Amino acid sequence: CGVTAAVERGAVLNRNFEVKEGRLEGAAVAREFKYTAYLDEADAVINFCKLKTHGMMGMTCAAKNMFGIVPGSVKSEYHYRYNNPMDFARMIVDLNRAKPARLHIVDAVVGMEGNGPTAGTPRPIGCLLAGKNPHTLDMI
């Protein structure tokens, strides 16, 4: 898959899974949040996501994919804490403000619709999108 070759050329895989705490002044809901420490070690974050449906948010795209910065053990806590769609969406916006990616790439060549994000039906869309603003990409 090319990962071994990339590491041999000097690429560094995310290995620091320490949980860190951050603060965001002016946050809508997530003034304090937890994230994975490797973000602090990165020269840049590039967000790769697959366009698909999501039961709570309607879809998973660039902005929602940044929920991936939250450590796995904390994700269920955040789903419980921000359990209505508007608060969950505000938390996603806060995370994107606190730890912004430099580039977002959306794979919408074949999306998924239906009971997302883990089940559904493949749907040919035929798009590959990239940009600096995750919210703009999500609106396209």
Regions found by a protein language model. Name each.
Residues C1-I140:
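Extended, low-polarity segments enriched in aliphatic/aromatic residues
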